[in-house]
Amino acid sequence: MSKRQLCILGSTGSIGCSTLDVVRLHPERFQVISLAAYTSVDVIFEQCIEFKPQQVVLVSSEHAALLTQKLNDANVSNITVLSGEQALIDIAECQNSDTVMASIVGASGLLPTLAAVNAGKRVLLANKEALVTSGAIFMAAVKASGAELLPIDSEHNAIFQCLPSQQQAEIGECQLLANGISKILLTGSGGPFRTRAIDTLESVTPSQACAHPNWDMGRKISVDSATMMNKGLEFIEAKWLFNVEAEDIQVVLHPQSTIHSMVQYKDGSVIAQMGNPDMRTPIAHALSFPERIESGVAPLDFFNTPSFEFQPVDFERYPNLELAIEACKQGQAACTALNAANEIAVAAFLDEKIKFTDIYKINETSVKKFVSQKVDNINEVIALDEQARSFAQTLLADFLQTEALSQKGNK
């Protein structure tokens, strides 16, 4: 059996570490060729010692120098340490790997992920923002290069598993409605504030927002789950992965996070994929597809599983989700602007600069500003992303000034 040669973009994050957990179980199947992260020197150093990659990228040159020193001190001399955004792109497209785990968080993962696609590799897509930000442009690159795109998000991986094999082979060009499928049912837990009084949401703290009831995730995606913007981004991603319209996707609240998503067929059947909420399951599925391998995740224990609950979405509680669904209908500019603004707003909330409910205000205003802008190629995507971030930063400055004046007036 020939080993898959892996490049893991975002190796020190939640998805990256879970990927290496699966790889650790199957040394006969996988070889780690390259790792990439932003600044997590200590974590990636330990990964280097264990998995012995040929190349490592830390975007920060300062942190790359620290890693080089740590490797030298450990008498490790056969690992090349690189730095910079271009180095991320270089290792993503380098022909010494055939499979790329694209798990860099946010729009910064777009160009490295696109580079892996253009190189015609098997791309395991955990970076939903890359597809949300570039949509049809990204999928056109997949088609042109012959890359094999496999979804890692638990919901999209679940949908993929529920599809007929011929539709799995047509990712991005699926013809679901013509092949007996009537709807995609995209499930979401509702996050930690599903039952909290709406009028108290403005007082939510970052630590509360990051305390997801079911999943262990990074801080940014945890906040997105609390606002359900994460589900909104997944809604947009589902449109492109499965070639459907917004009207063909329905979001269903499922607090237990046991059913990861469902596909509804025209004959009344609904096929669901379920399991314990652990990202190693979809990662193992995509790494070994079309085979099945051990993931390290215990199978679902039906006798100790709570009864399944399903609820409609309350958009008053989750306005960010409604905004994302509308952006999906409005077009690429709205989606690109929404993602950019949300990254700025969430970072500001995590830094305790704005309130939880201000995230929506920044997002909504940004989408309205850029919804009509032309986006026909990757350069225009990048330009709009930069413009939307700058605009969101301006809005943020206005929020901070208003808050400062308010506090001054109360003294």
Curated annotation (Swiss-Prot):
Source organism superkingdom: Bacteria
UniProt keyword Cell inner membrane present: no
EC number: 1.1.1.267
Keyword Metal-binding attached: yes
Cofactor(s) annotated in UniProt: Mg(2+); Mn(2+)
GO molecular function terms listed in the Swiss-Prot or TrEMBL record: 1-deoxy-D-xylulose-5-phosphate reductoisomerase activity; manganese ion binding; NADPH binding
Catalytic activity entry: 2-C-methyl-D-erythritol 4-phosphate + NADP(+) = 1-deoxy-D-xylulose 5-phosphate + NADPH + H(+)
One of the GO biological process terms: isopentenyl diphosphate biosynthetic process, methylerythritol 4-phosphate pathway involved in terpenoid biosynthetic process
Keyword vocabulary terms for this entry: Isoprene biosynthesis, Manganese, Metal-binding, NADP, Oxidoreductase
Pfam family, one: DXP_reductoisom
UniProt-annotated binding residues for Mn(2+): 153, 155, 234
Binding site residues for NADPH: 12-15, 127, 129, 218
Annotated positions binding 1-deoxy-D-xylulose 5-phosphate: 128, 154-155, 189, 212, 225, 230-231, 234
Pathway this chain belongs to: Isoprenoid biosynthesis; isopentenyl diphosphate biosynthesis via DXP pathway; isopentenyl diphosphate from 1-deoxy-D-xylulose 5-phosphate: step 1/6
NCBIfam families the record matches: Dxr, PRK05447.1-1, PRK12464.1
Function: Catalyzes the NADPH-dependent rearrangement and reduction of 1-deoxy-D-xylulose-5-phosphate (DXP) to 2-C-methyl-D-erythritol 4-phosphate (MEP).
Similarity remark: Belongs to the DXR family.
Name the UniProt record assigns to this protein: 1-deoxy-D-xylulose 5-phosphate reductoisomerase
Gene behind this protein: dxr
